[in-house]
Amino acid sequence: MTIIRKKHPLIKIINHSFIDLPAPSNISSWWNFGSLLGLCLIIQILTGLFLAMHYTSDTSTAFSSVTHICRDVNYGWLIRYMHANGASMFFICLFLHVGRGMYYGSYNMIETWNMGIILLFAVMATAFMGYVLPWGQMSFWGATVITNLLSAIPYIGTTLVEWIWGGFSVDKATLTRFFAFHFILPFIITALVFVHLLFLHETGSNNPTGLNSDADKIPFHPYYTIKDFLGVLILLMGLMILVLFFPDVLGDPDNYTPANPLNTPAHIKPEWYFLFAYAILRSIPNKLGGVLALILSILVLALLPLLHTSKQRGLTFRPITQTMYWILVADLLILTWIGGQPVEYPFIIIGQMASIAYFTIIIILMPMAGMIENNILDLD
């Protein structure tokens, strides 16, 4: 078996990536989320494949086909809710994975980090298009509002929006193409994940100390396969509790009403995992400014390697920047709450202040804190 594992041209790639991979001996449970994201992707692709067998991407039957899946297909309700809540688990793992990368300075592995940002954009695009497919009220109006943002692009904006819609409004053509893209993107994401891993294995994993761990490596299997398996069990337990006991807790009741272009919902809002970005978008009165802020809210992550001023890699031994980091986490929670609130006083001003704080902490305060810590520790 050892001979096959190390000699076979295909199996040896798997061996070098998941079995004999030298890993730091001290990586904590925060390093579990990469494998959990892989699991989430597999769950989403499998459940999505079975949903696609019964779904019809036509405006007149889309809503009914989702109802049919839940009522008439064997375990259709389970597949549908695993897919919907699986997306939420996917984003929870994504945010924790990115947060861990920010905390421990993993963004200094620039190729891996930038590939991760591309993956984040791809997953967000996939989730957005998936939310449109059930063709409920929030699906339709969410698609209308978000695609309409592209009309803010000077000169070509309106033409671009109509091109994406395939007409003069969100209609049958839009739904059909969103289904096509929603189906193909996860496979593109899977390919990008392998590129992400390729870049990661060029440098090796970071660790909680931020120090070079070449002198103290252990094989990935059995140590981290067992550790990842515990994470998998916890994730699956959390997902199944959500699916079997609270399947609709993260959804919007408006999406149980079929799409009606003549009736606008009182509060148009995306799924919970987009609310922080939606709050940043709404906090700027100018349409183009809001769109730019929305894109920059994610793209600002690409600036982190350039904004790294500290002589230390992670935040493990940096209390001032740690404080800034946790204020940023609290700020993101505030933005998520504001994104789900109506556009009125006092939510408008809270959203604007939280949006300013978000960019200020990342671009100004954290780099400044790094320089202060260098001076305190005489690391200059």
From Swiss-Prot:
SUPFAM superfamilies, sorted: a domain/subunit of cytochrome bc1 complex (Ubiquinol-cytochrome c reductase), Transmembrane di-heme cytochromes
Keyword Electron transport annotated: yes
Subcellular location, principal: mitochondrion
Protein name: Cytochrome b
Residue intervals passing through the bilayer: 33-53, 77-98, 113-133, 178-198, 226-246, 288-308, 320-340, 347-367
Cross-referenced PROSITE patterns: CYTB_CTER, CYTB_NTER
Residues given in the record as heme b b566 binding sites: 97, 196
Reported impact of residue 286 to S: In strain: Isolate AF 4995
UniProt cofactor(s): heme b
Any single Pfam family the record assigns to this protein: Cytochrome_B
